[in-house]
Amino acid sequence: YSATIADVAYGHAKRDPELPVLNFTFVCDQDSGDIVFAHAYEGSIPDVTAFGEIVFRMKDAGFDFSKVILVTDRGYQSLINIQKQIDLEVKFIQGIRLSEDIVKRSFDRYDASLHNQRFYDTGERVYAHSTTEAWKQYTDYGSLNKTLHLHLYRFPKADEAEMEELRLQVQQVLDLKNANKQVPPEKWLTYKRFVCERTTAQGHRYWDRDDNAIEAALRYAGRFAIRTNAEANPFKALSIYRLRGQVEQDFNQFKNWVDGNRLRCTDTAYWGKLLVCTLATSLRMMAIKGAHDREQGNRKIPNNSIDCLFTILKQIQADKRQTANAWVTRTITKKQRDMLALLGLENPPRVLKN
């Protein structure tokens, strides 16, 4: 809502698209969720374009890439960004868009393997086949040959689920068009390529499904690909990639629980708000992780909500003595003691003195 922040710009906001936005990227610890690096930049810059600068800034800040693997989703994927990570000697696991011709050809070539039970893993519940790619690392002293792993995956029944959902959405569009009703703009933009207008022999015009377009869109349904220089085993690579759900939990905490989704402040104050919200998110994530690690028996986070836990702790009270400069803690219930233990905290002292 700010009219003074210079870096806000109109981007691709799904919520309140009439408002300009500021992009804010997190890099979080895979285990604890603690935010280890954050970068804010103009809202009109897409993730894939900003990725290179983010990695360079992490390098300049002294981030030690030798001890970590950078896991990113398809939103950051491009051949240029892959090359930057190779040149900077970053270990990475990168989700890949299926729009690359080399990826499509690989799926076509190894389609039989992706239907062979020998290539199936019951733990990850996925078929996988791996191939290698030859890349170059460009240094000040010339180029070096590098080998990357391209992992191809097929998720059983996912292609049928995608087909069913696509057919359902297309049918809804057809029903509206043939009833001369308006299709919601976003829905029409997404599905208009799957319908076409036809004419009967009597000259009657009607809307019909374009099966060729649907078949082309579903050709690689249920497929996924990863490119990496860090893990040769496709199932281990996918297991690591799936852990990036921690990032989504971070953003959920930032946007929905610490008031980080709206900047109701000026150009001189928004950096402070971003810092405070980032610290608050890290503290909440560390509390959630620590509490889950300490769960045992009946001692669990109530309703799996850290806010319910905090509410129970807020009920701990102390009364001031009338005859002394001290506070006396009221009796602490077993439930409150359990919540303190989940956070790794000791029970407060019986008497608190100024």
Q: Across the structure, where does each feature detected by a protein language model lie?
A:
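Anion-binding and metal-coordination hotspots
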Residues: 1-354
